[in-house]
Amino acid sequence: MKKDELIFKLIEQENNRQCEGIELIASENFVSPQVLKAAGSILTNKYAEGYPRKRYYGGCQIVDEIEQTAIDRLKHLFHAEWVNVQPHSGAQANMTVFLACLQPGDYFLGLGLSHGGHLSHGSPVNFSGLSYKALEYGTEKENGKINYQQLEYVAMEKIPKLIIAGASAYSRDWDYQRIRLIADKIGAIFMVDMAHPAGLIAAQLLDNPLHYAHIVTSTTHKTLRGPRGGIILMGKDFENPWGRTTTKGKIKMMSEILDSALFPGVQGGPLEHIIAAKAIAFYEALQPEYVVYQKQVKKNAQVMAKALNSTGYKIVSGGTDNHLMLVDLRSKFPTLSGKQAEVALVSADITVNKNMVPFDNRSPFLTSGLRFGTPAITTRGAKEPLMEEIVELIDTVLSNVDNDKIVSSVKKKVNILMKDYPLFAW
């Protein structure tokens, strides 16, 4: 078979881009060589519809062991009674929960997209907003933190069947217990999407939502530092509250409903090569050095937020408890959009993403904010002093977005700087 020169050339170019630049996108990270090896392994050849020891295909005895290992490790990592490691993505994990818990047209409540929420928590262009009636809560205008009073008011007024906590651009920990109490008042299922802070939660640096939520979903990349994929977890399994029964009349456990909602409800065959890579990532997350890594992620984020703040940038919520921060550019550069800022920084090989901020007066295509995160740069071995240096480089670019010469000089500094940092340091 003739080698596909074009695609491998592009892969090499992407490798160079990742190595030469500063990666600050909060949802990105660099996986270990062994995770990468498993994700590209011969396991991609195997079809395995169903679950371990309950497959619709023969020859699954080895992938059964692999998937069961991933299940056991994930349970141990988050102290879960039940997990499912098959979701192809976080969005499909969320879709599974919706299918299991809601009927089309039912109300559910999630954090608004412009306040840091995720597409799959009720965006009108997403399955969640198209098939179900989305209600939203937001953050407080004064301090940028979750408006729990608004959340409770909407919940008590509309009685949603599902309440979602979790975000894609929120830098503080959550009061899961408070939301669970609200959910219990109205008989709602409480789901937490911990996709962003999952690694910090695994390292016990943030509150574990499995102690409070009925159901938890996550991605396996981001802070968890595994392959791209999703997971669903429960701290404790329970009888479904709707009285759904088996053909023999026994009330189904929630785990049974979630399993069947994922397969055959949302997906067909699982990606066993990715499940193997997930298993390795869970193994890595159970090692002592992983906790050290996550502590550094958090320290780096706090130093970066402090440096940005002292340079005149406004951090939404005033700081960070996790791995990310949302910067409102309007306080320092009123006429600079998030899109313009992103383009300028990417030109200097500093990769970030534009992001809406609470009460934004710009469209989602322009935005007034930038989101920064430290998981990827920390994986490369970066520590606190480099965070301060990076903020200086960011400020130089954003103060000179129309000056190609200055942006180019920053790019050269970035490329020289990153030569000392391997893609995966620990």
UniProtKB/Swiss-Prot annotation:
The modification N6-(pyridoxal phosphate)lysine is found at K222. Transmembrane segments: none annotated. This is Serine hydroxymethyltransferase. HAMAP family: SHMT (MF_00051). The record marks H221 as: Plays an important role in substrate specificity. Pfam families: SHMT. Its cofactor is pyridoxal 5'-phosphate. It is found in: Cytoplasm. The keyword Amino-acid biosynthesis applies. Catalyzes the reversible interconversion of serine and glycine with tetrahydrofolate (THF) serving as the one-carbon carrier. This reaction serves as the major source of one-carbon groups required for the biosynthesis of purines, thymidylate, methionine, and other important biomolecules. Also exhibits THF-independent aldolase activity toward beta-hydroxyamino acids, producing glycine and aldehydes, via a retro-aldol mechanism. Pathway: One-carbon metabolism; tetrahydrofolate interconversion; Amino-acid biosynthesis; glycine biosynthesis; glycine from L-serine: step 1/1. Homodimer. InterPro entries: PyrdxlP-dep_Trfase, PyrdxlP-dep_Trfase_major, PyrdxlP-dep_Trfase_small, Ser_HO-MeTrfase, Ser_HO-MeTrfase-like, Ser_HO-MeTrfase_PLP_BS, SHMT-like_dom. GO terms for cellular component: cytosol. (6S)-5,6,7,8-tetrahydrofolate binds at L113, G117, H118, L119, S363, P364, F365. It comes from Azobacteroides pseudotrichonymphae genomovar. CFP2. GO terms for biological process: glycine biosynthetic process from serine; tetrahydrofolate interconversion. The gene is glyA.
